[in-house]
Swiss-Prot record:
It comes from Rattus norvegicus (Rat). Residues 657-1105 are annotated as: Required for interaction with CALM1, PPFIA2 and TANC2. GO terms for cellular component: axon; axon cytoplasm; cytoplasm; dendrite; dendrite cytoplasm; glutamatergic synapse; kinesin complex; microtubule. Residues 525-581 form the FHA domain. This is Kinesin-like protein KIF1A. Residues 1424-1462, 1536-1576 are annotated as: Disordered. The lineage of its organism: Eukaryota, Metazoa, Chordata, Craniata, Vertebrata. Dimeric motor; dimerization is required for ATP-driven processive motility. Monomer in vitro. Interacts with PPFIA1 and PPFIA4. Interacts with CALM1; the interaction is increased in presence of calcium and increases neuronal dense core vesicles motility. Interacts with PPFIA2 and TANC2; both interactions allow the recruitment of neuronal dense core vesicles to dendritic spines and decrease in presence of calcium. Interacts with SYT4 (unphosphorylated) and SYT11; both interactions increase in presence of calcium. Interacts with MADD. It is a peripheral membrane protein.
Length: 1707
């Protein structure tokens, strides 16, 4: 087998007359084998180049040295293909191109000797080589077939018997073939030439009759070339059979360029169907043979559409099969044909990738005959099996092939008796065939196979006789049609009679012109149709040809000159020289005659022409050849039709029509828009009138101007400054808007194999991560001094995986580089892959993917504070080396001490680097400047411009407590109140004092010298080599002191720098302020010698560790499923939050049982996470979905009705693509909804006199209505089905329904399956205290926010309401290569906030460690310790922080305005105090107005304890696990409370009892009616968000809760997952019974009250509504619970205890 690619050649022709008339320009250029095409519409665009095996330049004249003649084309292609044919291979040559591109000229050529095409030259060369053979043992035979494919129909051009369309069939052995296609034997080139001429005549006749041209039909010329070699020694004859297929394809054209309409358009569609299928086949074969897919196993998707057209079906072996194939693409050079020429080049470019596996066809007959006989035997056996064996027996000719003539109604015998005797058998045979399944097909196959056998067994002499018989029939048929014959009876070819007048045909195709010649005999020559009553001498057919069309009358006049007169018949359209003839007209030689619409002839009279030449030797000759086009133009001109004018008029009419229709459409669209706007405005007014009551503006009184106090002005200024620099929304908009550029850059990087990854990153200007100047926007320099918070920018992190470097680009730089990347990508398609790979190995400065990278990389930064120089005492610091991401990379030991000017450095041994004394200046002007600024800059970076090098930031006097929090640094959150004393801190206040008395060694104007010694560096990873350190002051980043590099192996002792640097400073106020609060910056660098970057999906596999406030999602939170019944309304923008509630929601899926009840389906809780579970459902059972809402009763939350419950987004993965439109959304039928009472079993978890609200609704769910296979089938093993449910619930006083959304996880089992999980769940509740169905629910914790409607006129609100399109979901070319990578979005902001918090905490830790080290040093050196550093001061500070809400007094002993407690705070303080003191009055009841219900509950708890103070919490019988649950959530807010409570815990509610629908005027809670009436009803915007459970468990175990109204304690299992504590009945309970929101609760602890009440290990939790008393098992356990509930309080308690123990030990 020989595998070779298809040979592809392109050839460009000269301009034709049409192109020259339009002054076309040449757009094709050729150089060697490369062909280039230029886009005339965009000349600046880079020309497209294509490489082929041959590029033939035939655009110029033959005198051009680069001109490719017909001979050259044949030598390159034809000779090679002919040689392959002699070798025994199948050969195919086909030409492709648009109409008029020169295909037929290349394949057929002209009759002139030097103008012959590939086909005649190949045939002539074939017989020349045969005749030149001198080997007597070789014999050759040649057979020819010629067929035409027109409109998917096949016609035989050589056999006149085959008038109809031939069938294309497929044989299992022979493959596709044309049934009954004649194969004629030829013995010389003249025979082939005659057959080609005869075929063209037949093609011309048929085309003329059907008004066709060759450009609309495909011609296939097949040569069967057989070589026989006789071996004299073995007396064996071997054969080689080659099939030479020469194909002239139809023109590829576009309808808009040819103006085709009607039948021509249908014909063009059929042609384009064939050519389109050919293009699909070429593309599919090219893809299969391309590099990436070549070695892969063939897939079912690798389908080659051969059968889509007859052409590709017949050429199947030639395209990618057993053939040597060559393609010649004919090109038009004109710019007006750019699109068609480019399409042809692309076809050819794809075709050169096809590989054909050709084999030498040796001895095909013997093998084929054997296989065919085997098939005949098999088919005969099949007929015997069907009981039809006598068919073959009775229709067998002895000694010959078996023919089934009886099946077609023919008898091999000519006798009538034989025919009559077989009539009965034939009829019975037909009946048997009719009722025998499959027998007709078998007989048809048998017939087909026997016909092939007969053809193969035909001898060469028989083939010659059959060829001659067909030739005689063909010529007889042509003679009947009036076509001129030779004397021997053959048809005339290229021949011109010398005397007789005659007609020659003219055709649009030059190959068909002058192909047919009709004699005009003396007398009358009639022209008409074949079906005329009188025999016609010239037979024509087709449209507009009458039965008797016209008469040619030839009469001889004097002198022997014959005169021919044309007499048209009545009603016949006949034109002479363009004029319609209605009466006899004398013809002159050269006249053009048109009969009907498609038959065009030229009249030739040789004698008459000779006489005219003799009379007028200089007779004028026409300026252009008299051809078909000339006759057509003449006809139009004589008929008064100006084509150019007609086209211009038609074009003008079309433009006018287009203009009218466009104006009409614009008018209708405007009318429709106005109509819709009016309807929307009316609907909006209707909604406004419904939700917004009309307010009488006349009743509004003008408000008096409010007089603000100084403190209120400060608060307003602080709030204004806070929101002015707020960045969360703007950062999100930048991430969303630029995501598409990031995706495109990554896609191009992957396709070009650049090994560079791009990802968004947030950078904040902090001490640990200063921003370089090139990343700051231009406007940043102006507001840098006035910004109260460090700037956060969105940048692009560029990870160069090839060089192991990381760069940061601005978004503008990314867009600029992206333009260069696109240009590189476009150029890469034209550059060979080998060149691209070579370029990848060299990183040049011109590559937009790479930047220059330094040898050393920053390991991290460390900060050393200098406040020990105030006293002065020496300190040795061990500071952490922190990277810009907040990771500790190692530690650095640095010594700082004050020295005298002449003091020498200590001896550290060899290798010490001793430097001289450096002088640093501090300017007081900057200090005064910053003192006058009201808003200091926090955390200034060192990366200012040259004018800011002397910037002094230490004058701010900012200490440990003065810096903003991480939230303020990132501007993502806003604290409730501004930090007081922003410029002051306790440490700085203690260090402030008279500079001239307290700091004697730091007198202003004196010179102070101190020493900084870099000792060692440790714990630095071995991936960093050549470590060195440099340090500088924050304001003098240009003056850095550097150590020498040291080799780092990661093992052994720490790296010893021992670098000593003495620094002399002139003491100024700014210097003193600097050493009080500001550090020295140490930067550690190293050479990075590893490439740490993982693959492109790094962000997906290893996300940053989240903040403790933003936990990673266990399961993605889905957006609500769109409602199907509710009309889309404009969502009002929420304003200030009015109140919040915590909702505990139970979800159940109930299935119909045999007894008719709906029982909750089993839920598998083995996942371990709260609020999660998998529903185990049965297939094909009716179901209902039950949802129960539980919350504390409040006056602002009233449920009216469930508007709609929708389910959708059926999937088998937790994630869902919410951008896609889900067609399977189903709106459920609500069966019931309303408020319910909990069942008695649920009351055991509640306090009966606590107002609680249960709202439940139920809907029928038919899962089959989704039409989803995932819900209808049994779920496969290890697969889960996910579904999203959304409930739209209408609330009173709300503008729109609230939406609760939950993702369900389900597994479907067979209908009768016994679920394995149910057994484990029964074991789970095996104690008997819980019912089996109580665990069959999934819970969800939600936060309901009721907000006021925002003011639409607020500019800030309008900015926050702007909608920015998230471009990360937009498709980018090559996105599928990114393997799931996505640009970072909103989560990046939250992760960056956690990074900033880490950096802030690390900075505070270093500052605190410094102060502790300084205090310890001062104590050991017997120096006076400042008040801020003393233990007593620390204890007071901690007590102040632990009290939380305590109010320190001002200097005058009066509380500041902000510190005055309001009424609510006072009530809360009284409640907590009474809880701890346990001195409540026993008779205290609800009748007291000034005390809330929560105080009453706490009083009852206290009274219970006072009744039995001696009760042991762990030994009493009442402490055993009971069915009663303590009141974890008690009470309601009082009348004076204007804030809405935040419920924190929820009970369970199985099997509730429905209550009657509540009236809208009533409330489900016992709220005073007078209070409700007094409160004005304001419209609110509801928003419900699901709370995702944290995966981090801070503490879990048992706690004892004091039960109300009793002296007993109830034992409950508690799991703390901050910020919530989840309550369970036991450690085996899987359903959350209630939750406690720790973020809104306050934890109280008092040892004195424990001792007085004799209730050890207890602490209280106070919420907005009640207090809860809890007891732990031991003292250690209690402190652990305190740490889990409130880490700060636990730390304070432990600090006090440790100080107390140390004091006791000292005593």
């Amino acid at each position: 087998m020989a595998g070779a690619s298809v040979k592809v050649a392109v050839r460009v022709r000269p301009f034709n007359s049409r192109e020259m008339s339009r002054d076309s320009k040449c757009i094709i250029q050729m150089s060697g084998s490369t062909t280039t095409i230029v886009n005339p519409k965009q000349p600046k665009e880079t020309p497209k180049s294509f490489s082929f095996d041959y590029s033939y330049w035939s655009h110029t004249s033959p005198e051009d040295i680069n001109y490719a003649s017909q001979k050259q084309v044949y030598r390159d292609i034809g000779e090679e293909m002919l040689q392959h044919a002699f070798e025994g291979y199948n050969v195919c040559i086909f030409a492709y191109g648009q109409t008029g591109a020169g295909k037929s000229y290349t394949m057929m050529g002209k009759q002139e000797k030097d103008q012959q095409g590939i086909i005649p030259q190949l045939c002539e060369d074939l017989f020349s080589r045969i005749n030149d053979t001198t080997n007597d043992n070789m014999s050759y035979s040649v057979e020819v077939s010629y067929m035409e494919i027109y409109c998917e129909r096949v016609r035989d051009l050589l056999n006149p018997k085959n008038k109809g369309n031939l069938r294309v069939r497929e044989h299992p052995l022979l493959g596709p073939y044309v049934e009954d296609l004649s194969k004629l034997a030829v013995t010389s080139y003249n025979d082939i030439q005659d057959l080609m001429d005869s075929g063209n005549k037949a093609r011309t006749v048929a085309a003329t009759n059907m008004n066709e041209t060759s450009s609309r039909s495909h011609a296939v010329f097949n040569i069967i070339f057989t070589q026989k070699r006789h071996d004299a020694e073995t007396n064996i004859t071997t054969e080689k059979v080659s099939k030479i297929s020469l194909v002239d394809l139809a023109g590829s054209e576009r309808a808009d360029s040819t103006g085709a309409k009607g039948t021509r358009l249908k014909e063009g569609a059929n042609i384009n169907k064939s050519l389109t299928t050919l293009g699909k086949v070429i593309s599919a074969l090219a893809e299969m043979d391309s590099g990436p897919n070549k070695n892969k196993k063939k897939k079912k998707t690798d389908f080659i559409p051969y059968r889509d057209s007859v052409l590709t079906w017949l050429l199947r072996e030639n395209l990618g099969g057993n053939s040597r194939t060559a393609m010649v693409a004919a090109l038009s050079p004109a710019d007006i044909n750019y699109d068609e020429t480019l399409s042809t080049l692309r076809y050819a470019d794809r075709a050169k990738q096809i590989r054909c596996n050709a084999i030498i066809n040796e001895d095909p007959n013997n093998k084929l005959i054997r296989e065919l006989k085997d098939e005949v035997t098999r088919l005969r056996d099949l007929l015997y099996a069907q009981g039809l064996g006598d068919i073959t027996d009775t229709n067998t000719v002895p000694g010959g092939p078996k023919l089934t003539n009886a099946l077609v109604g023919m008898s091999p015998s000519s006798s009538l008796s034989a025919l009559s005797s077989r009539a009965a058998s034939v009829s019975s045979l037909h009946e048997r065939i009719l009722f025998a399944p499959g027998s007709e097909e078998a007989i048809e196959r048998l017939k087909e196979t026997e016909k092939i056998i007969a053809e193969l067994n035909e001898t060469w002499e028989e083939k010659l006789r059959r060829t001659e018989a067909i030739r005689m029939e063909r010529e007889a048929l042509l003679a009947e049609m009036g076509v001129a014959m030779r004397e021997d009876g053959g048809t005339l070819g290229v021949f011109s009679p010398k005397k007789t007048p005659h007609l020659v045909n003219l055709n649009e195709d030059p190959l068909m012109s002058e192909c047919l010649l009709y004699y005009i005999k003396d007398g009358v020559t009639r022209v008409g149709r074949e079906d005329a009553e009188r025999r016609q001498d010239i037979v024509l057919s087709g449209h507009f040809i009458k039965e008797e069309h016209c008469i040619f009358r030839s009469d001889s006049r004097g002198g022997g000159e014959a005169v021919v007169t044309l007499e048209p018949c009545e009603g016949a359209d006949t034109y002479v020289n363009g004029k319609k003839v209605t009466e006899p007209s004398i013809l002159r030689s050269g006249n053009r005659i048109i009969m009907g619409k498609s038959h065009v002839f030229r009249f030739n009279h040789p004698e008459q022409a000779r006489q005219e030449r003799e009379r007028t030797p200089c007779a004028e000759t026409p300026a252009e050849p008299v051809d078909w086009a000339f006759a057509q133009r003449e006809l139009l001109e004589k008929q008064g039709i100006d084509m150019k004018q007609e086209m211009e008029q038609r074009l003008q009419e079309l433009e006018d029509q287009y203009r009218r229709e466009r104006e009409e459409a614009t008018y209708l669209l405007e009318q429709q828009r106005l109509d819709y706007e009016s309807k929307l405005e009316a609907l909006q007014k209707q909604m406004d009138s419904r939700y917004y009551p009309e307010v009488n503006e006349e009743e509004e009184e003008p408000e008096d101007e409010v007089q603000w106090t100084e403190r209120e002005c400060e608060l307003a200024l602080w709030a204004f400054r806070k929101w002015k620099w707020y960045q969360f929304t703007s950062l999100r908009d930048l991430l969303w808007g630029n995501a598409i550029f990031l995706k495109e850059a990554n896609a191009i990087s992957v396709e070009l194999k650049k090994k560079v990854q791009f990802q968004f990153v947030l950078l904040t200007d902090t001490l640990y991560s200063p921003l370089p100047p090139d990343l700051l926007p231009p406007e940043a320099a102006k507001d840098r001094e006035t910004r109260p918070f460090p700037r956060t920018i969105v940048a692009v992190e560029v990870q160069d995986q090839k060089n192991g470097a990381t760069h940061y680009w601005t978004l503008e730089k990314l867009r600029q580089r992206l333009d260069l990347m696109r240009e590189m990508y476009d150029r890469a398609a034209e550059v060979p892959s080998s060149v691209v790979e070579d370029c990848d190995n060299v990183v040049t400065g011109g590559d937009p993917f790479y930047d220059r990278f330094p040898w050393f990389r920053l390991v991290g930064r460390a900060f050393v504070y200098l406040s020990n120089l105030l006293y002065p005492v020496p300190l040795v610091h061990r500071v952490a080396i922190v990277s810009e991401k907040g990771e500790v990379k190692g530690f650095l030991r640095v010594a700082v001490q004050a020295i005298s000017a002449d003091e020498e450095a200590p001896d550290y041994g060899s290798g010490v680097r001793q430097s001289g004394t450096a002088k640093i200046s501090f300017d007081d002007q900057h200090f005064e400047k910053f003192q006058s600024e009201s808003c200091p800059v926090v955390g200034m970076s060192r990366s200012g411009t040259s004018q800011e090098e002397l910037r002094i930031v230490e004058g701010q006097g900012q200490g440990a407590d003065a810096g903003p929090s991480a939230d303020e640094v990132n501007n993502n959150t806003c604290s409730a109140v501004p930090p007081e004393g922003l410029l002051d801190s306790p440490e700085k206040a203690a260090l402030d004092g008279p500079l001239d008395t307290a700091l004697d060694h730091l007198r202003l104007g004196s010179t102070f010298t101190f020493r900084v010694t870099v000792l060692q560096a440790s714990s630095i990873s071995a991936e960093y080599a050549d470590i060195f350190c440099q340090f500088n002051f924050i304001h003098r980043h240009d003056e850095a002191f550097s150590t020498e590099p040291l080799k780092n192996t990661g093992r052994g002792p720490p790296l010893g720098f021992y670098h000593v640097q003495n620094i002399a400073v002139e003491v100024t106020k700014s210097f003193i302020e600097y050493i009080k609060s500001q550090p020295i910056v140490f930067e550690v660098f190293g050479h990075y010698q590893q490439h740490p970057f993982p693959p492109l999906c790094k962000d997906v596999l290893s996300p940053l560790r989240p903040s403790r406030r933003h936990f990673p999602r266990v399961m993605p939170l889905s957006k609500p499923v769109p409602a199907t019944k509710l009309s889309t309304m404009t969502r009002p923008s929420p304003g200030p939050c009015h109140c919040k509630y915590d909702l505990l929601v139970y979800f159940e899926i109930c299935e119909l049982e045999a007894n008719g009840d709906y029982i909750p389906a089993v839920v598998d809780h083995r996942g371990g996470m709260p609020c999660m579970g998998t529903f185990l459902l049965h297939q094909g059972i009716q179901r209902r979905i039950t949802v129960t809402l539980l919350h504390e009763t409040g006056s602002h939350i009233r449920w009216k009705e469930v508007r709609e419950l929708v389910v959708g987004r059926i999937r088998n993965t937790p994630e869902t693509d919410e951008a896609l439109i889900d067609p399977n959304i189903l709106s459920l039928n609500i069966l019931s909804s309303g408020y319910v009472h909990p069942a008695q079993d649920d009351r055991q978890f509640l306090d009966s006199d606590i107002p609680r609200t249960f709202y439940q609704f139920e809907a029928a769910w038919d899962s089959s209505m989704h039409n989803s296979l995932l819900l209808n089938r049994v779920t496969p093993y290890r697969e889960k089905i996910y579904m999203t449910l959304s409930a739209y619930i209408e609330m009173e006083n709300c503008t729109q329904p609230a939406v609760i959304t939950k993702d369900f996880c389900m597994v479907f089992y067979s209908r009768d399956a016994k679920l394995p999980a149910s057994r484990s769940i029964r074991n789970l509740f095996g104690s008997g205290s819980l019912r089996a169905t109580e665990g069959n629910r999934v819970t969800g914790v939600y936060e309901l926010s009721l907000c006021h409607v925002a003011d639409a006129g607020s500019p800030g609100m309008q900015r926050r309401r702007r909608r920015v399109l998230d471009t990360s979901v937009a498709y980018v070319r090559g996105e599928e290569n990114l393997a799931g990578w996505r640009p970072r979005s909103d989560s990046l902001i939250l992760d960056h906030q956690w990074e900033l918090e880490k950096l802030s905490l690390l900075q505070e830790v270093e500052k605190t460690r410094h102060y502790l080290l300084l205090r310890e040093k001062l104590e050991t050196t017997q120096r006076p310790v400042p008040e801020v550093l003393s233990p007593a001061s620390s204890e007071d500070s901690e007590s102040r922080s632990s009290s939380g809400a305590s109010s320190p007094l001002s200097a005058e002993g009066q509380p500041s305005p902000l510190e005055v407690p309001n009424e609510r705070q006072r009530e809360l303080a009284v409640k907590c105090l009474r809880l701890l003191m346990h001195t409540f009055n026993r008779e205290y009841t609800h009748s007291h107005v000034c005390i809330s219900a929560s105080e009453s509950k706490l009083s009852e708890m206290s009274v219970t304890l006072m009744r039995d103070p001696s009760m042991s919490p762990l030994g009493a019988a009442t402490l055993t696990p009971s069915s009663t649950c303590p009141s974890l959530i008690e009470g309601r807010y009082g009348a004076t409370d204007v804030r809405t409570p935040q419920p924190c815990s929820r009970p369970a509610s199985p099997e509730p009892e429905l209550l009657p629908e509540l009236d809208s005027k009533k409330t489900p809670s016992p709220v005073r009616a007078t209070e409700t009436e007094k409160e004005p009803q304001r419209l609110l915007v509801p928003d419900i968000q699901e709370i995702r459970v944290s995966p981090i468990v801070s503490k879990k175990g048992y706690l004892h809760f004091l039960e109300p109204h009793t002296a007993g304690w109830a034992k409950r299992f508690v799991v703390v997952r901050r910020p919530y504590a989840y309550m369970y009945n036991s450690d085996k309970d899987t359903v959350e019974r209630f939750v406690l929101n720790l973020s809104t609760a306050q934890v109280e602890y008092s040892e004195d009250q424990q001792a007085m009440l004799k209730t050890p290990n207890t602490f209280a939790v106070c919420t907005e509504h009640r207090g809860i008393l809890l007891q732990a098992n031991s003292d250690k356990d209690m402190h652990d619970w305190l740490y889990a509930f409130n880490p700060l309080l636990a730390g304070t308690i432990r600090s006090k205890l440790s100080r107390r123990r140390s004091a006791q030990m000292r005593v």
